[in-house]
Amino acid sequence: MIQQLLREWPPGYGGVERVAHELASVWAGSVSSFDVQRRAGAEADALPVSYPRQVLPCSLPLGRLSLPLPSRPLWRLLCSREPLHGHLPSPGVLLVLLLARLLRPQRRVSVHWHCFLDPEPGLNGRLFALYQWVALRSLPWLSGVVTTSPLLARELVRCGCRAERVMVLPCCLSREQEQQMLQLPPRQRRSSTDPLRLIFIGRLDSYKRLDWLLQALATLSGPWRLEVVGDGPRRSAFEQLGRQLFAADARQRIRFQGRLDEDGKRRCLARADLLVLPSDRCNEAFGIVQLEAMAAGIPALAFQRHRSGMGWVGQLADLPWPQTPEALPAVLQQLAADPVLNARLGLQARERYQQLFARTVWEQRLQCLYPAADASG
């Protein structure tokens, strides 16, 4: 069995937690978490959990920085002979991985590199820049590196990782999620007078840039409707922006659904023609919700940013666009005006999902890649 370590409590709602959850469902090993947001026992699990979990005591966060505290669970994790797979970015996780490797040099200790961090101003930004510098220089000392897209793999190699130690394992859906999404019928082609039905799914924070989507929608000449699934500190600001841009029409055109469970999210996806994820940072590096949309037969739009695989996930042959914020209004207008293209892209999205991201494809990759990543110890 392979043990895992991550910052937050799985399965949660974030990409890192979901990846750890799916790995644990196959590996059946224990999952340790610092649970910085204190979610263990405070809320129901978003997905069924079949593996053991434990919380490792950690320091109170300084900004986003939280480090493990000495404890018996930590000592047992460090001294175990079982393979250990840690999820970055997290200074605390990196510290434990390095200590585990130091205590048992022959132990298999690998890392999942989920994203690079954009530089930010202030003390926090400098601390995380230092962390990323240390992390990149520590990777060759570990048994192997798994990342989520070919773009991130190339960037890791460019930063000094040996190519044979870097493995690509895209994110995946659970078997149940995949089955439910694939069972949704193909979208019926809407008429030219029907509104384009868009959906945004994610935490309502500054870097998700829902404001860019709202501003792009304000330029469209045809009818549209937007469902916003998720909650966060910027919700009221985004609601206010919607009222400023669309006045009395805002309530009719935009529905803020808040956080929904998996069934509620699936119902929203079943109504949608298009998913848009306009994130502006490379720490949004994959976007698992794109897989849900693509499996459901919905094209997904995301920006292709430096050190991110977001744009790569949903790229479709019949929609060549620059994948930049500046190009978003034009591509939305194109899809709003061409229902035939929109329907064809939905079929292509499902086909791309089945070829690259299907659960069976992921399981085959996992079976091959993880032993290869750790073969040398």
Positions of PLM-derived features:
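Nucleotide-activated donor-binding/catalytic signature segment of Leloir-type glycosyltransferases, i.e.
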Residues: 239-263
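Conserved acidic donor-binding segment of nucleotide-sugar-dependent glycosyltransferases
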Residues: 314-326, 333-340
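N-terminal strand-loop element at the rim of the active site
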Residues: 4-66, 232
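Carbohydrate-associated surface elements
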Residues: 151, 171-172
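Conserved donor-binding/catalytic core segment of Leloir-type glycosyltransferases
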Residues: 3, 189-208, 214-218, 227
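An aromatic- and histidine-rich active-site surface loop
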Residues: 70-71, 83-106, 110-118
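Nucleotide-sugar donor phosphate/pyrophosphate-binding loop at the beta->alpha transition
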Residues: 108-110, 118-141, 175
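Short hydrophobic beta-strand element within catalytic cores of glycosyltransferases
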Residues: 295, 299-304
